[in-house]
Swiss-Prot record:
Species whose genome carries this gene: Schizosaccharomyces pombe (strain 972 / ATCC 24843)
Lineage: Eukaryota, Fungi, Dikarya, Ascomycota, Taphrinomycotina
UniProt-listed GO biological process terms: silent mating-type cassette heterochromatin formation; siRNA-mediated pericentric heterochromatin formation
A Pfam family matched in the record: DUF7905
Listed GO CC annotations: nucleolus; nucleus; pericentric heterochromatin
Signal peptide as annotated in the record: none
Name of protein: Uncharacterized protein C582.04c
Length: 583
């Protein structure tokens, strides 16, 4: 075949894979899969040529990375459409996976019948004089709750699944204000008491939230603005915008009108900002950004705050002394999260390094010039099981520096602080480890790479295909005066094959996604983390859920100066950043 002049400036190299058994199979492959091969050429910016009589394959490429991608894509294409790689039945199943199987359906029916018989047995009222090998009580911390009303009547139907799984009797003793659990196994008793405890506190938190009066919470840090957005959302999503049905203001002065159908209060006097800040209830309840105004969201109930995911903090700047002692894998976290508009966020990333205090001192220091990139792949394997695989880059190109599966993550620490009258919080650390039986996932991750221009390459195989992906670019900064870590994160989501202008699909083979090409779901976030918490948790990161931590699970351990002080410090940082975007 004649060479195309457009590709004459590129390097030419013979490709040794895939290997074909006969010359007929070789020519048939290139004639039959012209469309798929042209797709590989388009996504790798390369040219693939073959010689009909010698079975030689040549690739014209720009970079060695593109040559490797084109070679692997050809091999994947060959494996996916031949008897060695995938049978016709498997190929048909791949396109239309079967979800129900007769044997599984029969087993499910048998399990339902068996569970119904077990539940019928353990719902009976047992003679109190009978003794069991294992008996235990869970005493309610508060007796002002109507147990029968909120836990499923006299039979306490909310605990039915616990009865079935642990094969135990569960009753409520009003005089003792306790749940009475009896069974024939000490192991089952411990599990049952633990699950009863979790269900109780979860239900109590929901009840407390339902009884809470819907209060508007306002946090604004722009002293230069004369218009303030009021926003309330009962369900606490991060970025839901709609007009509130009602607004409750607390002890507002008469000079400020109370809106009924409007979401704006126009402030007349300069001091109105402080008046509004003092008189509007701004408890730990809501965090939002709405039309450029920074709001704050902190969860109430269970959990109040969380530490999520696992990552590796590699500190390149020698002046960040504290973080250097935590180079081992540790959690990426969120406690306070602020949402910014796109324009503000882009500007913030540019001005943080140049920000100075009134005395001329530097305010922020960057952890690295390159952002940390995390890509969450929502995948489905050949058995129809969905999972989320996360790949993390600490550099701006090349292979991922780490990866983990959501399904293989486990809790190394779980501490819950309950206070039925005020706030409760739950702190846990999740660690991800590649599973020992993840051959398909290891093959999938081996084909993931990122180019210098922000293109993410991966392979849909006969065993795993990607349904959607989320790209997160995190810029990490060190606030020098407070010691807080400040993370500005860009969130971008894409559904494979859903956008016509983006060259992605569900078919086996090479896929390429350009970061920034799908802005249909795009938002920015700002989060804070106190590195001192790492010292409290470093000794407990490998402890199992049932093991007690080495510290007291009290709010004072994490907030020795109070949660309010932590929030006020974070707010002051946001004020400084927000002012810089206006100047």
């Amino acid at each position: 075949m004649a060479e195309n002049k457009k590709f004459s400036i590129r390097k030419k190299r013979e490709c040794s894979y895939p290997t074909f058994r006969t010359l007929y199979e070789f020519n048939k492959f290139f004639l039959r899969y012209k469309t798929e091969i042209s797709k590989i050429q388009r996504r790798t910016s390369s040219l693939i040529q073959y010689e009909e009589h010698s079975s030689a394959i040549f690739i014209y490429y720009e970079t060695p990375q593109m040559f490797d991608l084109a070679t692997k894509a050809l091999q994947t294409l060959y494996n996916s459409h031949t008897r060695e790689g995938e049978t016709k039945a498997a190929s048909k199943w791949y396109r239309n996976p079967r979800k129900d199987f007769p044997s599984q359906e029969a087993a499910l029916v048998r399990k339902k019948k068996r569970d119904a018989l077990i539940l019928k047995k353990y719902l009976l009222n047992v003679d109190p004089s009978l003794s069991f090998r294992a008996e235990g009580l869970f005493t309610l911390p508060s007796d002002d709750l109507d147990v029968y009303e909120f836990f499923g009547g006299e039979n306490l139907t909310l605990f039915n699944q616990v009865r079935v799984d642990c094969q135990c009797y569960i009753h409520y003793l009003p005089k003792l204000a306790a749940f009475y659990v009896r069974c024939d196994s000490v192991k089952n008793l411990k599990v049952a008491l633990k699950r009863v405890k979790h269900i109780f506190y979860e239900q109590v938190s929901l009840i407390r939230l339902e009884r809470t009066q819907p209060i508007l919470h306002l946090m604004n840090f722009d002293d230069y603005s004369t218009s303030y957005e009021l926003f309330y959302d009962r369900n606490f999503p991060l970025a839901k915008k709609y007009k509130p049905n009602s607004i409750y203001l607390h002890r507002l002065p008469e000079s400020i009108p109370t809106p009924v159908d409007s979401v704006k209060i126009n402030l007349i006097r300069e001091r109105s900002f402080n008046l509004l800040k003092n008189f509007v209830s701004a408890s730990l309840f809501n965090v939002f950004l709405f039309s450029g105004t920074v709001f704050m969201r902190v969860k109430v109930g269970i959990p109040l705050f969380e530490r999520l995911k696992v990552g590796t903090n590699k500190v390149k700047n020698n002046s960040v002394n504290i973080a250097q002692s935590f180079l081992e894998p540790q959690t990426r976290s969120t406690f306070l999260r602020y949402l910014f508009s796109d324009e503000v966020s882009v500007k913030v990333c540019h001005v943080l390094k140049e920000l100075r205090s009134p005395t001329g001192e530097k305010l922020f220091e960057s952890f690295s010039d390159d952002p940390i990139t995390a890509v969450h792949f929502e995948v489905m394997n050949c058995k129809g099981v969905q999972d989320t695989l996360t790949a993390i880059w600490n550099t701006n190109s090349g292979k991922p520096s780490g990866w983990y599966l959501e399904s293989t993550m486990y809790k190394a620490l779980d501490v819950t602080y309950y206070n039925l009258n005020t706030l409760s919080w739950n702190l846990y650390i999740e660690y991800g480890h590649p599973t020992q039986n993840s051959t398909f996932y290891k093959e999938f991750i081996s084909n993931i790479s990122m180019s210098d221009d922000g293109r993410i390459y991966f392979m849909n195989t006969r065993d795993i295909k990607v349904r959607s992906l989320v790209v997160k670019l995190k810029h990490k900064y060190w606030h020098l005066s407070s010691g807080f870590h400040l993370h500005i994160t860009r969130f971008e989501a894409h559904d494979m094959g859903k956008v016509k202008d983006i060259d992605t699909d569900f078919e086996p083979g090479l896929q390429c996604y350009q970061v920034g090409s799908d802005t249909s779901v795009l938002r920015y976030g700002l989060s804070f983390w106190d590195p001192k918490w790492d010292y409290l948790l470093a000794d407990n990161q490998h402890k199992q859920q049932w093991q007690a931590p080495s510290y007291k699970p009290l709010i004072s351990e994490f907030f020795p100066m109070g949660i309010e002080h932590f929030i006020e410090t974070a707010q002051s940082i946001v004020m400084a950043v927000n002012r810089s975007t206006i100047d």
